[in-house]
Amino acid sequence: MATAPSPTTMGTYSSLISTNSFSTFLPNKSQLSLSGKSKHYVARRSSISCKATNNNNSNNQNEQQEESSRLLGKLDRRNILIGLGGLYGATTLDRKPFAFADPIAPPDLTTCKPAEITPGGSETVPCCPPVTTKIKTFKPDLSIPLRTSPAAHQVTDEYLAKFKKAQAAMRALPDDDPRSMVQQAKVHCAYCNGAYPQVGFTDNDIQVHFSWLFFPFHRMYLYFYERILGKLIDDPTFALPYWNWDSPVGFPIPDIYTDTSSPLYDQYRNADHQPPVLVDLSYGGKDDDVDEQTRIDENLAIMYRQMVSGAKTPDLFFGHAYRAGNLNTGKYPGTIENMPHNNIHIWVGDPSQTHQEDMGNFYSAGRDPLFYAHHANVDRMWNIWKTLGGKRKDITDTDWLDAEFLFYDENAELVRVKVRDSLEPEKQLRYNYEPVSLPWLFTKPTARKTKNKTKAKVAATQLTSKFPATLVEVTTVEVARPKPRKRSKKEKVDEEELLIIKDIEFEGTEAVKFDVFINDDAESLSRRDKSEFAGSFVHVPQGKTTKAKTKTNLKLGITDLLEDLGAEDDSSVLVTLVPRVSNSPITIGGFKIEYSS
């Protein structure tokens, strides 16, 4: 078994790079409506029947088997939680062992195993933390001074000197110190690349991506990382900076991370994406040949879509529910996690490295100090989202609120935290963000076509009617709308219309991206600042413990999009998928439109 090289380069930084379950979806043989033999296909606004077939029954059986496994696993898991004395028993004293709740439990560090980089464990990396039998329960400390995170592109010289001193001190700690840069980077590796089995469900690994755990896990990860840095320079007011990639002034990588003699530098970054190059929030592995203004327009429209029009509900913003015993398949990410979070990881990572290290792979992302500035802005998006009104509020499900993680704090003590400990950062965690302008808030995508010219033209040969299908070229399908009528304003507020792309199957150790367009011309697709662009599916390479392919879903809110396109009365929509990046086949299981409250 090959082992990935240890991150010895983390100690040096002077070298420079040369340059909940779904209902039925489309059956195997879809009841799609195709126009005859003309050169182009003009969308017919007729009703399309999508009836369940054996394929869907199989999907339901798989879901039922997973639920049965979870129910059986509960007894085993609760026996473990009750019976273990030492390490894990110490972490579960306040649990209600017979309650019918299934939050993800914190990992048992004694069961940690090498993290996977390639399918089936052919290549691994050691990411396990030091083990201790003493675990504290997190309690907010209101005596901590309030810390304000600055925008990285406008920090003062005084702040930068302090930040560099703290980062250098963290790098200088022994590798086996849980507060060291080496160990802090391993935190992300262990939780994201299959190092921790779920307690009571040892065949299922803990995965903090593609679900509602994404935001709270990374918030608490950054919290303890920041507290360690502050302790190392004896400054409790120190706060990490955020990379303001949601605004044109912050689109380039902040200059403070590009000095090759600085402890903030990482040598494994894409040499073609150094300042003053603007970040591409829709990047998937290949650079687009667009001018600077187009990049700005597209980035701002993407932010509006991911924060406003496409993220009206907690379900869309946070992602799929993830409970104890759930498999790491069939989930879907929230809007910001999927895009631009994933895109930025890939954009920064070094394509000349085997696994796109450092930022381009979850196992190595934490080795780059820029990772923490990136995630500080991701966290900032959570704060901002909750101020935008409507249903944009935190999840109230106790399986989310009581999900738990383990982190080492600034005193090298292991701490157990719950998601509910992270919901009010200023009050519970004593930090906030320096306010800056939000230009994306006023950059709503506009329709490419006028409302009286919305019929899309698609070559007949590009229409696909059988699913599952392999996505190897531009593919268009007609999908029925259950409510083919213009809904009232209240109805739109009460229920968001969703396009669901189900059972997206691919090799999870590779980067994947495809774009989604609605009612657009397949032979001449819109720019990403147009309403016809519905979004993207983006995957950052990550390890796994089996050779099975990764399977997930994508949910896109399309209420505003259909309104912009004048398609609210249409009985169906044309959905076009455009593969952008993948070194192995992508399989699409089916499509459906449904409504979510």
Swiss-Prot record:
Required cofactor(s): Cu(2+)
Residues that coordinate or bind Cu cation B: 341, 345, 375
Binding site for Cu cation A: 188, 209, 218
Primary location recorded for the protein, binned into one broad class: plastid
Alphabetized UniProt keyword annotations: Chloroplast, Copper, Disulfide bond, Metal-binding, Oxidoreductase, Plastid, Thioether bond, Thylakoid, Transit peptide
Residue span of region Disordered: 49-70
Class of this enzyme: oxidoreductase
UniProt-listed InterPro entries: Di-copper_centre_dom_sf, Polyphenol_oxidase, Polyphenol_oxidase_C, Polyphenol_oxidase_cen, Tyrosinase/Hemocyanin, Tyrosinase_Cu-bd
Enzymatic reactions: 2 catechol + O2 = 2 1,2-benzoquinone + 2 H2O
Disulfide bond annotation, renumbered to this chain: 112-128, 127-189
Site entry (Cleavage), positions: 429-430
Biased composition (Low complexity): 54-63
Cofactor: binding details: Binds 2 copper ions per subunit.
Family label: Belongs to the tyrosinase family.
Protein's UniProt name: Polyphenol oxidase latent form, chloroplastic
Organism, scientific name: Prunus armeniaca (Apricot)
